[in-house]
Amino acid sequence: MEVTNLIEKCTKHSKDFATEVEKLWNDELSSESGLSRKTRNVIRNILRDITKSLTTDKKSKCFRILERSTINGEQIKDVYKTIFNNGVDVESRINTTGKYVLFTVMTYAAAELRLIKSDEIFALLSRFFNMICDIHRKYGCGNMFVGIPAALINLLEIDQINKLFSVFSTRYDAKTFIYTEYFLFLNINHYLLVSGSELFINVAYGPASFSSPISVPDYIMEALTFKACDHIMKSGDLKYTYAFTKKVKDLFNTKSDSVYQYVRLHEMSYDGVSEDTDDDDEVFAILNLSIDSSVDRYRNRVLLLTPEVASLRKEYSDVEPDYKYLMDEEVPAYDKHLPKPITNTGIEEPHATGGDKEEQEQQPVKVVQSKPDDGITPYNPFEDPDYVPTITKTVLGIADYQLVINKLIEWLDKCEEECGNGGEYKTELEEAKRKLTELNLELSDKLSKIRTLERDSVYKTERIDRLTKEIKELRDIQNGTDDGSDSSEIDKKTIRELRESLDREREMRTELERELDTIRDGKVEGSCQRELELSRMWLKQRDDDLRAEIDKRRNVEWELSRLRRDIKECDKYKEDLDKAKTTISNYVSRISTLESEIAKYQQDRDTLSVVRRELEEERRRVRDLESRLDECTRNQEDTQEVDALRSRIRELENKLADCMESGGGNLTEISRLQSKISDLERQLRECRGNATEISRLQYRITDLERQLNDCRRNNENNADTEREMQRLRDRITDLERQLSDCRRNNESNADMEREMQRLRDRIMDLDRQLNECKRDGNGTSSEEVNRLKTRIRDLERSLEICSKDESELYSAYKSELGRAREQISNLQESLRRERESDKTDSYYRRELTRERNKIVELEKELNKCFDTNHAKYIDEINSKKTRISDLERQLAACKSNGGSNGDMDQYKREIESLKRELAECRRGNNGSHSDCKYYDEEAREEVKRLRQELTQLHEDLKRARESDKNDSYYKRELERQRAKVIEVEKELERYFDDSRLAECKRHGDEMLRKIADLEKKLRDGGNGNGGNGCTSSCEFERKRIAVLEVEVRKSMETIKSLEKFMEFDRLQKDCADKLDREKERRMKAERDLEREIARKNCGGNPCERELESERSNVKRLEYQLDAEKEKVKFYKRELERDRYLSSRYLTSSSDPDEKPLPNYTFPRIEVEPLTTEDTEPKPVEVVPPSSDVTEPISSGVTPSVDAEPEHPQLSEYQTSVSQVAVTPPPKPETPQISEYQDYSELYSASNNTESKNVFSELAYLDDLDKLDDIDEYLLNNIMPEKTV
């Protein structure tokens, strides 16, 4: 069901998503887990809805619809929160396929909706992909994959994409194969676009867009959420570009290959090549054959189209070339502006029709349009499993030949590159290439001519129909009316014109038949007629489409020209934009630096401006305070008041004297006056406290000056700051000056206070005198008392005024102090911010250094990874060389078969004979097809039987491969050890050959002869001299014989080892030759099969061709199965032989009960030292005796040994199993053995020096399975042998 509204679409897709997740909710994750095509399409549909909603006002609504969908009765939002659990132990919670899909889709949807900055998206995806790696590592689900939507990819830079890629590439334990391939494709695509490739294909919908110059697999398109209904635009130079739109059917079963529909992209722009539906089999992939195959690694059909079962997906390193695109079906591009094509047609089936062949050929095809009221179900050929598609007249076959020619030209180019300038096949390759080019040009010309003729045929056919209708109408008129000669003349003229038109049409038809016969490369009876009938069948279906296409092209030509001009201008603008982007990026970096500096200076300037404003306010307030202080001072310094007080005091004194004289007074009034005087004194003391506050303010100003000096030192490089500091300095000078004025005012206040103190003292004296007067009984007159009260009130008023001025001055100084404190706090805050900014800058510098070091380490890791993959590249090069040699052999076979067309003529004669027999059979059966139908059914039964056999062979092959997995370790081990053995053989060839082997045998024979001679002499000496005098000599000779026997055994073991290596080399070469023969036989069978298929495709019954193809497939699979079985048997035989040789060698060469023989010196035997590859458990060493032995054994025998044996000269290659035997060094001074030196002394001496002279030998076959690197084993276990 097709939905047009976005909200309705989102609702439907959310329900489908919830249903699919419920189905997969209990499927546990494992190595076989994977998403089907239906599940991938459901995920793509819901993510597309979220992406489309980003450009509308419904984005939050679409996301809420998804969140509110229910899974198992619970909303998706709650289920997601339960699974995520704040990122704690996510890998343990996501243990099923349904939970995996829900977790990834909700994460991507939330990221698309809420994140717009690339840094935020990168941080989220880094954490998310680490969780994905943990899940894959725990469950081994390497085939699970839900890629990043294009809406998020477009917001990321390439550096961020590479960092996300490193999350997967560094997690070696996590099996994230498809994620790695996804990011590898993004990297390859980006660097091809950056390199300036003008050939590209662009796909876009809504805010998402993606461009690629190479083929794009379907799983990449699904991950980027693109569909075949999106807008597609391609470069004009891309001629062979195809878009796959749908999976039609599966071959045999779902595990085999499938047949897909594709659309060839002829135009530069499409609004979609298929209809926007929710089909479960919908596919979208881009195949680009116009680019070099060495760049496009996804051209291979196995990589381009993902199989239905995800576990059958193969990686790039495992696939073989597969370009079976001929089996897919081409369909026309969908155009939403045109009417839908007729899909339900009633066509008579070929096996159910009757009548003669001629009647069938002349009978037109009946096309019945389906009506909604019809009760009959229309025939759908795609639902019929026995349906055989009829060959229609299209350019598909020629286009396929065009693809084959392009592929052959590409292969020939590679062969020419491999052959070089002096290759013997160069001339043949050039000739073949020239012929292919000519054939390509001829096909192109014929193809263009056929298209022209087809268009003309359509036009002429329409005209014939139109004229036929007119003729019929004219005949009806002529038969119905007999009056008027003018009308008959007109009719005759019209009929004449129509006959001329018919003649021209016949000539055009004849020319078309000739062209078709020419293309068929021969005159075939009735082929042109049949081709025309088939072309009519096809043209009838596409009649309306072609008419609309012609009209559309006429109307769009000017639009295309305008678009081309716009594209050129856009390219020019793009170049200018790239240049502007680089310039802008440089300017942005510079601007960011300047902005940081400006911000810093702006902060300082703002702080200084605030300080300046505050200082201006302080200056104004200080002026006000100064004016008030001056007034107060003037008031306090008013001498008139002081004189008045003095005169008043004198008057009081006089009156006091009068009172004393008069002897009377008012004691109550005097006491009240005394209390009033004490209050005045208290107020004077409070005024005195202002001086201490002024001194404290002076100290605060000094502290502010010190802090301003510190700020000046921190900003000494800033000229503006210095000027501002200078102004502050001047202001501080003014403040100091004002402070000095205040101090002078305070000094004047101190004088006033001293004067008042003196007056208080005077008043106290007066009070004392008054009290004395009271005691004397004197009184005062009421008049004088009133005057004193009035004066006291005046003094109180003056004191209040002075106190008020002092309080105002105190409040002003207090406010100034608060502002100064606030200024200090602001300066401290600015200083703290500057220090924090310095710390932040240093932190960023450290982070930058750390990131640079990390980049260097990653580059080292990349180089290391390239070094480790060098062997893989070499193997790939060797496989390419093998493929080139196969192609050369195939080319030689083609040349040998190309000289004569006998086979082709024979095939054509056979086809003609089969056709004649078929016609006679049909005529003999009176038009009935019973026999044909019988044989057709028999052929179908045979096909079904062969399919069952093929399925059984597939299962056998699968079981064989599963059984082979058990031996995969041994196979890899054997292959690795083979490589090592080859290296060892190369080293052995430098030191050992047939002559050296013969020399070793000769030395062994000489030593045996010498041993026999010594035994004979010993027996002769024992029989002739049977006394104690020869006991020591006999013992010495026996020990010498024992040592020689040890040397002989070692020499024989060396010879046996060499013989084993030679036998292994022979077997290895035989097996390699056998494998090569098997490969050649298999490739020859494949080539024969391809030629047979090509021969059958030239003509014949479709059932016969299908039967032959099935038989060839069965044979090919049998060959593959036999080859796989032979490989398994060969690996098992080699492994058993290797183990048998190693076990036999160990049991034969080592005796656990054998004790090591003591080493004694013996006379020098001129024999070159021998080396061995086999290892004994306890090797016997010949050790020189101690140097203090001087007496000989007998006068006639003087044994000589090497005092310090030298090591043999080893090759520079340390991986060889054996050493080179060298010529012994010249004899040193001969030490002598004392006759009193007994056996124990010699044995102890040998044991003391044994640790220095013992060398270890190689136990090759025993330890071969335990080591991964034989070079390391040889370096650690082989020590040079000392020469005896």
From Swiss-Prot:
Species of origin reads Cowpox virus (CPV)
> Anything else of interest in the record?
Some orthopoxviruses such as cowpox, ectromelia, and raccoonpox viruses, form large cytoplasmic inclusions within which mature virions are embedded by a process called occlusion. In those viruses, A26 bridges mature virion with inclusion bodies through interactions with proteins A25 and A27 on the mature virion membrane.
Q: Where is this region: Disordered?
A: 340-383, 1169-1234
Q: What is this protein called?
A: A-type inclusion protein A25 homolog
Q: Which domain of life does this protein belong to?
A: Viruses
Q: By its UniProt entry, which InterPro entries does this protein fall under?
A: Pox_A_type_inc (IPR007596)
Q: Which Gene3D superfamilies match?
A: 1.10.287.1490, 1.20.58.130
Basic and acidic residues: bias regions? 348-357
Residue segments, region 10 X approximate tandem repeats: 611-912
> Residue spans with biased composition (Polar residues)?
1211-1221
